[in-house]
Each structure stands twice: as C-alpha cells, then as structure tokens.
Regions:
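Conserved AMP-binding/adenylation subdomain of ANL enzymes
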Residues: 1-8, 16-58, 68, 72
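Nucleotide donor/acceptor-binding cores
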Residues: 7, 13, 84
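Hydrophobic/aromatic side chains embedded in well-ordered alpha-helices
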Residues: 8-11, 26, 109-112
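Residues at the C-termini of beta-strands that transition into short coil/loop
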Residues: 13, 19, 32, 39, ...
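Gly/Ser/Thr-rich phosphate-binding loop
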Residues: 33, 56-61, 70-147
C-alpha cells in the first residue's frame, strides 16, 4: 500500500477480527500513520463522512462493505480526492466493483487479499491493483505467494 507517516487510514472493519486489528492497527503503527474508526459498528454513511472530513488516503473493507459504501448517496460536499489506496479482503473483488472503486472513490491502487483470519500476518493470496499503469485485462493477472 506504500504507506507513509502522511497517510490516514479509514478502518471500518472490527478490531475483534484480524482484518481490523492486524491489517488496520499494525499498518499505521509500523508506518507512523493515522487511523480513523468511523463508528462502533459498520455504517456506510459514517465511512463516507470520515473519508471526506478526515481526508483519508486509505480505506479497508470487504467487498460487501464497499458495495454498501457505494450504494448510499454521497453527503453534500463529499470529497474523496485524497483517497488512493486500501485493502479489500475476505473475497475476490468482482470486476464491476473494481471499476466503481476507480471511478467513484478515486481508489487508483488497492490490495486484494484473503486468508487473514487463518494466517494473520501471512496472506494466502495478494494482488495489488494499480491504475493507470495496467489495463483491466492485465489487472486480472494474479500473483500468488506461497508459504513453504
């Protein structure tokens, strides 16, 4: 994700799961970044407000969270121009969702992974998607990392 001390992570996944705790908290602790928890429970409207009000540069969530975030009306004055990266975990990311993340949330780079609940710090699958360096055809080429 190319985090730096200047990044601000919006982390709606719960801290009682590896995603929120390991991929959320440890990402900011190891890079000196800032973390925003938009609410006690997942609320897509609260996430949109956090992205805009806190000028978040990264967003974590599962595909269904991103679908919910994209499915609610944007608040007045919504600005996601700082948002660039994040992690989408728990399931593969459908191509239509990829396009919407690029077009509607300005997420020009993100990491897709799953297997964190079983492997914590070790990912069974990871794919970093960066645009505009690759076409959508090339986006679907996956890199597999195996633990031996």
């Amino acid at each position: 994700m190319d985090f730096s001390p200047f990044d601000i992570l919006c982390c709606p996944p719960p801290l009682f799961h590896c995603f929120g705790l390991v991929l959320g908290m440890l990402a900011v602790v190891t890079h000196g970044s800032k973390i925003i928890f938009p609410g006690e429970t997942f609320d897509p409207k609260a996430v949109l407000h956090a992205i805009s009000d806190e000028k978040c540069t990264a967003l974590h969530g599962v595909p269904t969270m991103f679908e919910a975030i994209l499915g609610v009306p944007k608040p007045e004055g919504f600005d996601c121009s700082n948002l660039r990266t994040g992690i989408i975990a728990g399931a593969p990311v459908p191509r239509p969702l990829m396009k919407r993340l690029f077009g509607e949330l300005n997420m020009t780079e993100y990491t897709s992974s799953y297997g964190t609940a079983w492997n914590a710090m070790f990912h069974v699958f990871m794919l970093t998607v960066v645009r505009p360096h690759r076409s959508f055809t090339n986006l679907l080429q996956r890199r597999h990392y195996r633990l031996h």
